[in-house]
Amino acid sequence: MITTATQDTTSKTITVVVSRGQSRNPEKRGLEQAVVELAGKVEGVDVIVIPHLYDLPKSSESFAKLKDIEGDLVVVSWIFSRAAHWVLDRNGICGKVGKTQWTDEDKADDDSGESVASEAPSIEVEPTEVVDRVTDLYPRPDRQVYCLDLKAQNDPKVFVSELRRIMGLKEPSSDTVHLPIVGGQVVQVEEKTGRRWYPVIDFDRCTNCMECIDFCLFGVYGVDHGENILVEQPDNCRKGCPACSRVCPENAIIFPQHKAPAIAGAEVDGDEGFKIDLSQLFGAPTGSDDPIATAARERDEQLLLAGRDAVGIDDQLKKRQSDLAAGPKDRLDNLIDSLEAFDI
């Protein structure tokens, strides 16, 4: 069901999508509503309020509504910005990643003081071989999709300030705040959803290597008519299992509801990734387990729960382990080596 609250209309410039969270926490609901109300007062903005992005099926009324929009989008949700972008992409709402001036980690930085990266030594990075990504071969439409994470800020005015920046609008002065409000329309889409768990592929990183389809034994992955990887049966995925994300060579597989930021879609490439607790970067247990061993164990747990036999680290995973061990060190390896060299 769709309900609409219409104000004085102007020519539409941009659509803001506010995705409600799964929680009924009154503070979170209050933040959502405040963003809706403030954004709805900006000239040239239409607002659509939908249920939680990740829980919506592909056939949902919400996604059908969003597919009809051709221009730029600003999407505000409770999952990491990167995760939100690729949830939309897999459901047919495609575009290029819009650049924002603040990140998912802004609030965490303000609360925690200096980051690990600020104290880390400079690291020489060896050039890596250029590899074609799926979006290099199949470019997305030439429009911008800006995704903002509600977890990053608790002041609705910050979101609206970023919206105005994206639109190229100046902040309202004290002389204009009392003028009549000229906004767009606010559309609320009401539909029932249930909590889901499935992988989301970041095609800006994916190289179509097929490691995930070879690893997953639950029929989650498939290929399209162009032999590109896709999440074919999302609801076949075992709830709580992120094992395939650990074996992905490009960190292209996202589980938006996972507790580990790197798996949930936080940006971890480059120095900004080192702000995350390195010992828990991929949510692995403390100890000597590598991501491949952890992935194999998680897969076996789900196989046993499904009444099937465990397979452990098979020949393909052993080869992957040996390739990783023989390969050049990455930025994380170099950082850890540098930290170990400190005289502390």
Say what each PLM segment does.
Residues E61, L88, G95-K96, D106-D110, ...:
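Charge-rich, low-complexity amphipathic helices
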Residues M1-V189, G194, L332-I344:
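Iron-sulfur-associated redox domains of electron-transfer enzymes in respiratory
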Residues V49, A83, D149, D155, ...:
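Poly-acidic low-complexity segments
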Residues W78, L217, P249:
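Short glycine-/small-residue-rich Rossmann-like dinucleotide-binding loops
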